[in-house]
Amino acid sequence: MTNPAPSDALVIAGKHYRSRLLTGTGKFKDLDETRLATEAAAAEIVTVAIRRVNIGQDPNAPSLLDVLPPERYTLLPNTAGCYTAEEAVRTCRLARELLDGHNLTKLEVLGDEKTLYPDVVQTLKAAEQLVADGFEVMVYTSDDPILAKRLEEIGCVAVMPLAAPIGSGLGIQNKYNLLEIIDNAKVPIIVDAGVGTASDAAIAMELGCDGVLMNTAIAGARDPILMASAMRKAIEAGREAFLAGRIPRKRYASASSPVDGVIG
């Protein structure tokens, strides 16, 4: 991935990243495909579901760390599968033990198994506890602008509103709420969940999101490695388009050729 100017790096908890594409590590057919897709995406931050993926809990089983070493990647342990604040906090503390004091974590507390929408009450409760416990919390939440701001005020280092339900592939469903969240934020806003294809990722970046996290859109594609590459390019293009500034929408045409001095 092309190195951005230092002023355009993604900064999370004081650390600078070149890539604005964050990827998950679940749903791939094996660890080798996970590695290849992560490399094709040029991701630097990768999420790990502590309750589902081995990062040392079972010393006799293959470990994700064998293919995605912490020396090369920022591992982002997440609380996928947690439905209460207590479960989420306990999972984060386990991750910190397994990763030698690693404090960066992705908090998600789900409301039900059908929608996988966040339980915002439990999310707020867990976020407060984790921040007080010294964690650097990146938090999965709804696209409610008021809630997003509240999570920032609690001390979360990044807010991660959904674009659509997890794994749905529906794309950006409420760009106006995302714009409101972005406009009011002083921490990175990273779209999490709902991306289905490269154009969805580009739209999120064109809106002004600081990054996009995805898993199913890549792992569930017919060719995950190729899709990872497509997503990387979409993120880059969307970011450049945002920085360049799109032209305003108009109802009527506007000639692209100058009209002054037209012959005849």
Curated annotation (Swiss-Prot):
Pfam families attached to this UniProt entry: ThiG
Subunit structure as annotated in this protein's UniProt entry: Homotetramer. Forms heterodimers with either ThiH or ThiS.
Pathway: Cofactor biosynthesis; thiamine diphosphate biosynthesis
Annotated localization: Cytoplasm
Chemical reaction(s) catalysed: [ThiS sulfur-carrier protein]-C-terminal-Gly-aminoethanethioate + 2-iminoacetate + 1-deoxy-D-xylulose 5-phosphate = [ThiS sulfur-carrier protein]-C-terminal Gly-Gly + 2-[(2R,5Z)-2-carboxy-4-methylthiazol-5(2H)-ylidene]ethyl phosphate + 2 H2O + H(+)
GO molecular function, one term: thiazole synthase activity
Family: Belongs to the ThiG family.
Protein name per UniProt: Thiazole synthase
SUPFAM superfamilies linked to this entry: ThiG-like
Organism encoding this protein: Xanthomonas euvesicatoria pv. vesicatoria (strain 85-10) (Xanthomonas campestris pv. vesicatoria)
Gene3D superfamilies: Aldolase class I
Family matches, as InterPro entries: Aldolase_TIM, Thiazole_synthase_ThiG, ThiG
HAMAP family xref list: ThiG
Assigned GO CC terms: cytoplasm
EC numbers: 2.8.1.10
Role summary: Catalyzes the rearrangement of 1-deoxy-D-xylulose 5-phosphate (DXP) to produce the thiazole phosphate moiety of thiamine. Sulfur is provided by the thiocarboxylate moiety of the carrier protein ThiS. In vitro, sulfur can be provided by H(2)S.
UniProt entry keywords in alphabetical sequence: Cytoplasm, Schiff base, Thiamine biosynthesis, Transferase
